[in-house]
Amino acid sequence: MEGLLTRCRALPALATCSRQLSGYVPCRFHHCAPRRGRRLLLSRVFQPQNLREDRVLSLQDKSDDLTCKSQRLMLQVGLIYPASPGCYHLLPYTVRAMEKLVRVIDQEMQAIGGQKVNMPSLSPAELWQATNRWDLMGKELLRLRDRHGKEYCLGPTHEEAITALIASQKKLSYKQLPFLLYQVTRKFRDEPRPRFGLLRGREFYMKDMYTFDSSPEAAQQTYSLVCDAYCSLFNKLGLPFVKVQADVGTIGGTVSHEFQLPVDIGEDRLAICPRCSFSANMETLDLSQMNCPACQGPLTKTKGIEVGHTFYLGTKYSSIFNAQFTNVCGKPTLAEMGCYGLGVTRILAAAIEVLSTEDCVRWPSLLAPYQACLIPPKKGSKEQAASELIGQLYDHITEAVPQLHGEVLLDDRTHLTIGNRLKDANKFGYPFVIIAGKRALEDPAHFEVWCQNTGEVAFLTKDGVMDLLTPVQTV
């Protein structure tokens, strides 16, 4: 038990946030509810009824490759449900995980001075025509006309919109800079061949930040600051990322880096030097010379999923829209810009791809939709007398461990065996599964505790369970 406690206490820690109580239902399982009087019952969580693999997969567009572990698991478990090619319904478990991810992102962005905004998804064509990206983006840009014939696009990114906003402020001073403005919103891209579920879709969530500085030197400092925040984010999530030099593509600029999760199904080809810290997307390298440009050692090739991208833009956009500020000498000066993206839904899917087994979802500890699932005995079984104990344990956990209020599910499907419910809990990847089995009838009662992220199983008393769960931190 001591080893189990030590490992669980080592889980990433973040400040606990308050939670909304919507979604709680009156307790049907145990009549003696605590003051809050609510329990989260698994039977009330919305799940698609037709989760048989053949049925779910038949709903997919025939051009959509189902060769990706995360996509298969998310469909089979009921985390997502197909809507149309490249578009998915995000179901309750996924929404909870995504909201937690957004909270972690908010913490990291605001820790470096980021201010959250929300820009329209509809972007006027003239903004994109000014930068020539209306044509450069080609068919990937989703375009439409309103009833007056005015053209718009559904923005995949917002460099034009944010720069036009800053340009409209005519009395900006250097004393107000830097601005670090970011949003977490839906984005759209007309992918010719959507694939791999949330890894490459037509509609997705992205965090995009745009920075405005008073000088190239200050902009480079901001660039490093945001990159460090990205590193901190992925470290907190426990994801094995690599930062690589990258091409600027249609966004432009002079410096660019990608944050990649190395995995076999990744669409990006990476070159990593095992001797030094050099790493790059292979599209930036001369393929005829595959030695490290830093130490001349041989480069190792791998594949990766891009989950973040950073760009130092300079004055590429500010010069077009005349986004200026008044410098220390009182002269109008173009702002130095950067832009920074995180694929929110892609991070979720990529994390499942990297961390999960072939049959069971595994989450970054901070992002698990629920931290624990409690399984009472089957109705009519010899252990049914322990039902009251598991209800009391649920109430005690949610009252005595404030950060776990709203983080614990009670699997009240007591018509099913413990084994069947444990199998389901394993598939969903709750970090902790607590079972009232035969040993719950002992004096004192012992609960079977599965720690999914370490693979350990222990039999603990009520006090032992509390010692295990009290250090768990949520976001």
From Swiss-Prot:
GO terms for molecular function: ATP binding; proline-tRNA ligase activity. Gene3D superfamilies: Anticodon-binding domain, Bira Bifunctional Protein, Domain 2. It is an enzyme of class 6 (ligase). Changing residue 364 to R: In DEE75; uncertain significance. GO terms for biological process: prolyl-tRNA aminoacylation. It is linked to Developmental and epileptic encephalopathy 75: A form of epileptic encephalopathy, a heterogeneous group of severe early-onset epilepsies characterized by refractory seizures, neurodevelopmental impairment, and poor prognosis. Development is normal prior to seizure onset, after which cognitive and motor delays become apparent. DEE75 is an autosomal recessive form characterized by onset of severe refractory seizures in the first months of life. Its main location: mitochondrion. Mitochondrial aminoacyl-tRNA synthetase that catalyzes the specific attachment of the proline amino acid (aa) to the homologous transfer RNA (tRNA), further participating in protein synthesis. The reaction occurs in a two steps: proline is first activated by ATP to form Pro-AMP and then transferred to the acceptor end of tRNA(Pro). PROSITE patterns: AA_TRNA_LIGASE_II. This is Probable proline--tRNA ligase, mitochondrial. Belongs to the class-II aminoacyl-tRNA synthetase family. Keywords: Aminoacyl-tRNA synthetase, ATP-binding, Disease variant, Epilepsy, Ligase, Mitochondrion, Nucleotide-binding, Protein biosynthesis, Transit peptide. GO terms for cellular component: mitochondrial matrix; mitochondrion. It comes from Homo sapiens. InterPro entries: aa-tRNA-synt_IIb, aa-tRNA-synth_II, aa-tRNA-synth_II/BPL/LPL, Anticodon-bd, Anticodon-bd_dom_sf, Pro-tRNA-ligase_IIa, Pro-tRNA_synthetase, ProRS_core_prok.
